């Protein structure tokens, strides 16, 4: 009898667990170091109420006249966010790590990097949201610029 109660309690507890969700974002924005350059990319994420995990790929274009390198990043991130949108806004903070490749002319550097930042997902219609994100990347190794700031806007689909 005691085992039956324990199993029933466990089943009730598991049946009330919150649903996992996933989302995808395509974005375009600007990276600011050493000059403003276009950046674009995508994210894929999944999580529970407050904690989420996402993979992000970003590609910043090279600007030879300003000696500004291209930067490609592949980062795994953890997001801490509000469990639901508040007046249509869902703010979040994020931190992550991964690899980068910086190139300028014939020179390149591939190494490890970390990023920290935050943003907001803005409800538009149904599962479609806008996303505004700010990140600071700290690049290890010998990059031309070891700190890069990025701001983007994107279209986010929650599923």
Regions found by a protein language model. Give the residues of each.
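Predominantly the C-terminal beta-signal and adjacent terminal strand-loop region
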Residues: 125-159
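Solvent-exposed loop/turn segments connecting transmembrane beta-strands
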Residues: 30-40, 63-70, 104-111, 140-146
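Outer-membrane pore/translocation modules
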Residues: 23-35, 148, 152, 157
């Amino acid at each position: 009898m005691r085992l039956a109660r324990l199993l029933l309690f466990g089943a009730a507890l598991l049946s009330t667990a919150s649903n996992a969700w996933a989302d995808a974002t395509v974005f375009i924005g600007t990276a600011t170091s050493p000059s403003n350059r276009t950046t674009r990319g995508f994210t894929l994420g999944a999580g529970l109420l407050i904690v989420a995990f996402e993979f992000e790929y970003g590609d910043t274009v090279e600007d030879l006249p300003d000696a500004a390198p291209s930067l490609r990043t592949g980062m795994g991130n953890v997001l801490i966010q509000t469990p639901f949108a508040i007046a249509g806004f869902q703010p979040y903070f994020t931190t992550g790590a991964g690899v980068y490749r910086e190139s300028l002319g014939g020179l390149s550097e591939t190494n490890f990097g970390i990023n920290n930042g935050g943003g907001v997902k803005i409800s538009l219609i149904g599962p479609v949201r806008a996303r505004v994100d700010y990140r600071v990347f700290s690049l290890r190794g010998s990059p031309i610029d070891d700190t890069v700031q990025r701001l983007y806007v994107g279209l986010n689909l929650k599923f």
